[in-house]
Regions:
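Alpha-helical solenoid scaffolds that mediate protein-protein interactions
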Residues: 199, 216, 236-240
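A non-transmembrane, solvent-exposed segment enriched in polar/low-complexity residues
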Residues: 17-183
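Sec-dependent N-terminal signal peptides
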Residues: 4-13
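N-proximal helix/coil linker or "cap" segments that precede and/or mark the start of modular domains
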Residues: 228-260
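Helix-turn-helix repeat elements of alpha-solenoid scaffolds
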Residues: 185-193, 223-230
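Amphipathic alpha-helical repeat scaffolds of TPR domains
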Residues: 175, 205-219
Length: 260
């Protein structure tokens, strides 16, 4: 899950695209106790601090944003902390990644389960329901498909700890078990990487795929070889040449090739 979260962070730093002629609206609905406070629309900027582009009041569980957007990745920040009280970043302040486009968008969530700004293992976490943005729909679909790989890798990590690290610390010879689990883990990591590369190639015209490519070329993961990177670069050039995102991708591409 850390991988998914990281890729979400890098996406926020880097995405850009063209907008429609009309604007967007975000109609937010929160359920749960004390659903009153403030909401912010925040845009992350590459190598800079986040920028708050809009704010509004959350009243009786409802809030609204409207405007026009060119860069599609934003974050909805909901702050239900009362003035003067110690901020609670787990239960009263929430952060949701949103691929915003110029359309009518709805945001529905329960304050009891919205993902907090800071992760808390003891707290149930459930993403809000977001509708009306086709780009965000693609992002959600991708994460659902990735979940199979992530869950399997998490299980293998737990097995490695329980079946190898703990017994090994007790002086038991379990090296064969450890090697078997490690090989299985590498196999699933390769499967996950292949899925993500296939996704990038299939959706090269989408900001979601552009963000995934930037994530890997930023050094958090490593693509297989220079040929694979060059093929990916050619696909993006058709749709992104001349944009700020393309320029950043070029720089990351050059740096990554030097590392190989």
């Amino acid at each position: 899950m850390k991988k998914i979260f990281l890729l979400g962070m890098v996406a926020g730093l880097l995405a850009s695209c063209q907008s429609k002629t009309d604007g967007y609206t975000i109609e937010g609905t929160l359920t749960g106790d004390a659903a009153s406070g403030k909401a912010y629309l925040e845009r992350s900027v590459y190598l800079s601090d986040p920028v708050v582009v809009d704010s509004t009041v959350v009243q009786n569980g409802s809030f609204t944003f409207s405007g026009k957007v060119e860069r599609r990745v934003y974050y909805v920040i909901i702050d239900l902390n009362k003035p003067g009280e110690e901020p609670d970043y787990h239960n009263k302040m929430f952060r949701t990644m949103l691929y915003l486009e110029n359309s009518d968008i709805t945001y529905k969530g329960d304050v009891a389960t919205l993902p907090g700004v800071y992760y808390a293992s003891e707290r149930e976490s459930k993403s809000p329901e977001i509708t009306g943005s086709s780009v965000h729909d693609l992002f959600v679909t991708m994460n659902k498909e990735i979940q199979v790989y992530s869950d399997t890798l998490n299980t293998l990590m737990e097995r490695y700890a329980d079946e190898y690290l703990v017994p090994e610390s007790e002086g038991k010879d379990v090296s064969a078990v450890g090697m078997e689990i490690a090989r299985e883990e590498m196999k699933w990591k390769d499967k996950l990487l292949q899925y993500q590369l296939d996704f990038i190639k299939k959706h090269a015209d989408s900001p979601v795929a552009m963000d995934q490519a930037m994530y890997y070329l930023s050094g958090m993961e490593f693509l297989p070889d220079v040929k694979e990177i060059d093929q990916m670069q050619a696909l993006f050039e058709k749709h992104w040449a001349g944009t700020a995102s393309w320029n950043i991708l070029q720089l990351l591409h050059q740096r990554h090739v030097r590392w190989l």
